[in-house]
Amino acid sequence: MKALLLENISGVARAVFEKAGFDVETTATALPEEKLREKIGDVSILGIRSKTHVTKTVLESAPNLLAIGAFCIGVDGVDRDACNQHGVAVFNDPHSNSRSVAEIALGEIIMLVRRVFAANSEMHGGHWNKTAAGSHEVRGLTLGIVGYGRIGSQLSDLAEAAGMRVIFSDVTDVLARGNARSYSFREVLEQADIVTLHVDGKTRNRNLFGEEEFRLMKPSSYFMNLSRGFVVDHEALARHLKEGKIVGAALDVFPDEPESSGPFSSPLQGLPNVILTPHIAGSTEEAQQNIGQFVSSRLAEYIETGNTMLSVNFPHCQLELVPGSYRLSHIHHNMPGMLLAINKVLAERSINIERQVLDTRGEIGYAIYDINRPCDEVLMRRLGDIPHTIRFRVAETPRSLQFA
């Protein structure tokens, strides 16, 4: 079996897959769709980061693909509906780089409020300008966090430790940490000295922040976005920076990001007290190693056992492997009678079901079975031919798999 790892994924992942018996190919960059279609035909596991787009067309060129690992938080570039249609499980890591993002956010808050980057630019330009004008302590300032998930809540802890008052807004009713307090979206914008966005990539957040939202912010406030590029109207932000309503900004994500190292353009370039970074908030060596270990382990476990815990598109099913039993898994459309149909095929062959679990998620149903004897070719064909079956898989030992 083959694993294809794109975008310079941590070598930790390669080691996990090689230990599991995979042939591993790696690339340092994302691949354009046509090139990816050429390479993916014999691939069982595809590893990506945020630049790769796995479309329906790509999946149609990947008959052997069993699972995709997004070695990042977001899975915006993966067509999950098409993955469901092809029986491809998708996994990501929503945790491992949260600390890295929270730390750089706090660092940028301090850099903005102290005008460090503006002073740095003057010094590199040969101008000494020792002044306290426009430079402040963060202690006592109000930080407004929009999106109080894993990253937002960790930033809340760090900011409070630095002496800041923390308020937040979230679309769900989440528990506040420390002394942080929940407010409406509008109230956060009106009260915060610094507004920072940490929202997810769902459609509801597209164009979340534009002209109207910037007008609601306090005069001489700061703005940060380390979430998704499509969340913010950068032209509107540039206008408010030039007018002095917003006195500093930090952005790590952009509406149109290059696929690899190369030219970049933004209306925010050249503006004073604006920090621009190339989508690196979560890119620390520690985070990438942890993500590499976590996602590759989830993928290897899925291939070896069929367990789908933490999949972003499949139902979450898990059965402990028991020596002496034979495991099969069945991906199907969520239709009445599927469990009965599978059990009937097994019963007709006098096969005993030792353990089973079935769950559904939207249009997808997923079942794991442990049975008392191996599947022969006739049984494999019968199970694969059950109406509404998407994919059937049987494993006689953890690393000896057959597919139908």
What residue spans do the PLM features occupy?
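Short glycine-/small-residue-rich Rossmann-like dinucleotide-binding loops
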Residues: 51, 193, 198-201, 227-228, ...
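NAD(P)-dependent dehydrogenase/reductase Rossmann-like domain
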Residues: 261, 281-404
